[in-house]
From Swiss-Prot:
May play a role in DNA repair. It seems to be involved in an RecBC-independent recombinational process of DNA repair. It may act with RecF and RecO. Belongs to the RecR family. Signal peptide: none annotated. Residues 84-170 form the Toprim domain. This is Recombination protein RecR. It comes from the Bacteria. InterPro entries: DNA_Rcmb_RecR, Rcmb_RecR, Rcmb_RecR_Znf, TOPRIM_dom, TOPRIM_RecR. Keywords: DNA damage, DNA recombination, DNA repair, Metal-binding, Zinc, Zinc-finger. The gene is recR.
Amino acid sequence: MNTYKNSLNHFLNLVDCLEKIPNVGKKSAFKMAYHLGLENPYLALKITHALENALENLKTCSSCNALSESEVCEICSDESRQNSQLCMVLHPRDVFILEDLKDFLGRYYVLNSIEEVDFNALEKRLIEENIKEIIFAFPPTLANDSLMLYIEDKLQRFHLTFTKIAQGVPTGVNFENIDSVSLSRAFNSRIKA
């Protein structure tokens, strides 16, 4: 016997796809699918177009690995930013969060994963940009502490100052779950790593 739900394959497929977005549960996915499919199909078309454009144009900056729509991102090509400081973050989304604070005027380097770090290119960048300080803007975890020590060891011959953002950022919490005041305070109170 066919049920009503079985006859709505396309709608249920949309719900299933939306549910795969982080932090979106089945009820929220259903509400979004219903809204986009029935109440506001124009918005659905706008979202589709925006997704196509983003997928077609987004790439990573060849210098810092942040999101960009060109070979080199706006931050790396901005001559007015301080070259002496390089802020290392784990994910491209962390650059968005820190930039919103407007507390850091230096450059960034997005790690993504330690396996992907091109230390030769990073070392070249340290020399060319005359970087004096590396700021680790990582959420505090034992794994991230180990990562900082590893990077410090790999770059010790450059006699850099290594700092990390101060505690106050709860252990095990991602940046997007921290209020901007706490994150700003932690960033401005960074300590030697």
